[in-house]
Amino acid sequence: MYAPNINSYKRYQAGSFAPTAVRWGADNRTCSLRVVGHGPSLRVENRVPGADVNPYLAIAAMAAGAVHGISHELSLEEMYAGNAYEDADAPHVPSTLRDALVLWEESELARAAFGDEVVAHYANNARVELAAFDAAVTDWELLRGFERL
């Protein structure tokens, strides 16, 4: 829901100001959730979704996560104060659509929030995208192949 295309994952690189670690912090751009503002303007910024998301689905996913956390009385981790790119203990955002597909299909939370049909639909969409990508010969592959001939 947050990174629907193959190219969505290219931005998840350390030092890119796109998050790689699933952490939250106060005005910390290395975290996936950034708390910013003061008083009535205090807000949480989810930095994982890119410009290529369906905003309605991204908001639905955030709401589903919030409801899940509240209904299961999950405790909030301590605020992260360092460089989250360097946090080896943090869970990480998937680095490819292929990795995200596995997590999506195995997610009980996604199935509970969206239903089996929606999970299957977006899983199929990812498979179609991956098959098209796997069949394409990129400029890099052509150049690399000619370098070695």
Language-model-derived ranges and their functions:
Residues 84-149:
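Acidic, glycine-enriched catalytic cores built around paired aspartates
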Residues 1-80, 84-87:
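Active-site capping/gating regions of soluble enzymes
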